[in-house]
A protein has these predicted regions:
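Conserved, charged catalytic cores of large soluble enzymes
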Residues: 10, 14-33, 37
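C-terminal non-catalytic regions of proteins with extracellular/luminal or membrane-system context
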Residues: 1-2, 6, 14, 42-166
Length: 166
């Protein structure tokens, strides 16, 4: 009933108020030009590089961009800004998707970079099935026609986290 919803909302927001979740935080006043400054970007880059784990390398990495080749970047997370943030994040001042970054790196190398979504992260009823069904065959054909395929799959912050109902 409406009364039950009201009581539940009061309990929820009273608890959040008592926890201080509505209090002013000095962290809210840090401007983007500080958050996204060169020093912080370099530190974030260093943390990312040092935290990468390579489980197996059969001579594939590091990639050589000297030869002119074709590269496929495939997957719903390859061109997703939502996939770049976790569920405990602030709003980044800027972000570069995997396909954007790879395209920028390869601009002057002669590599041809092509992107294919491959699939959706979840079944979206607003997208007609006819449009969903072509994605995987398109991605497979692209991968077969390229010298290298980078596949970006997994979850993003819209699908994983806390306090979410599916």
């Amino acid at each position: 009933t409406e009364e039950e919803i009201r009581r539940s909302a009061e309990r929820l927001f009273t608890t959040r108020y008592l926890l201080g979740l509505f209090d002013h935080s000095s962290l809210d006043e840090i401007p983007y030009n500080v958050v996204g400054c060169k020093e912080h970007r370099e530190l974030a880059y260093q943390a990312a590089v040092e935290s990468c784990v390579l489980l197996k390398n059969d001579g594939t990495l590091p990639l050589s961009l000297k030869d002119n080749k074709r590269m496929a970047v495939i997957g719903p997370n390859a061109d997703s800004h939502a996939a770049l943030v976790g569920n405990y994040n602030g709003t980044p001042p800027r972000s570069i998707t995997v396909v954007e970054g790879i395209t920028r790196i390869c601009e002057d190398t002669g590599w041809d970079v092509t992107y294919a979504e491959g699939c959706l992260l979840y079944d979206d009823p607003s997208v007609r099935k006819v449009f969903q069904n072509y994605r995987i065959p398109e991605a497979v054909a692209l991968a077969e026609s390229c010298d290298l395929a980078i596949v970006c799959v997994g979850l993003d912050s819209t699908l994983e986290g806390e306090q979410g109902d599916v």
